Amino acid sequence: VNSTSSFLYPVAMLMDAGIDPARDMKQIILAGSHANVITALAEGRVDIGGASFDSFEKAVKAGSIDPAKVRVLAKSEPIPYPPIAMHPALPSKVQQQLKGAFNSVHETPGITPDQIRGYGGHKVDRYDANFPESGMDAPAKKMTRVNDQVKAAIIKKASDR
């Protein structure tokens, strides 16, 4: 219930569409991982599921799911990867050197695109050490709607089998 791309965002998107998952869904299964959600969809055990699109594409490429049999209903706006943070007491010069290194790693001799990875080991084309903190505001606001009360209601519904 704390996964951004397989729980918080999909639940928030349902809520944005006027759907209360705990009230409006006949049954809820908390599958536990993106791969489990995709497997449940592929096997017809669930009608809908939330997972990262990266995981869906990976499953399609691996032949784990037939895209002709599963329809993508919606995709969220891009979700920022978790930030890499540094302690504010670091000397300014060191902070700038670190930012510069991350911003230019994709141009570093000997570094290939396959070596640049983000959250969960997913390939990224580059890092952006200048991403403003305010860029996290909209995603944080969206996820805040899925509060402890909403989570508790969904967990309770999932336990009613």
Regions inferred by a protein language model and the residue ranges of each:
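Stable alpha-helical elements in mature extracytoplasmic
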Residues: S6, P10, V37, S52-F56, ...
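Sec/Tat-exported extracytoplasmic proteins
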Residues: A17-G18, G32, R45, V60-G63, ...
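Short, surface-exposed acidic
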Residues: P21-K26, P67-K69, Y127, V146, ...
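Short beta-strand->loop
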Residues: D24-Q27, V60-P78
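Catalytic-face loop-and-helix region of soluble metabolic enzyme cores
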Residues: P82
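An extracytoplasmic/periplasmic, membrane-proximal ligand-sensing/linker region
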Residues: M86, L90-R161
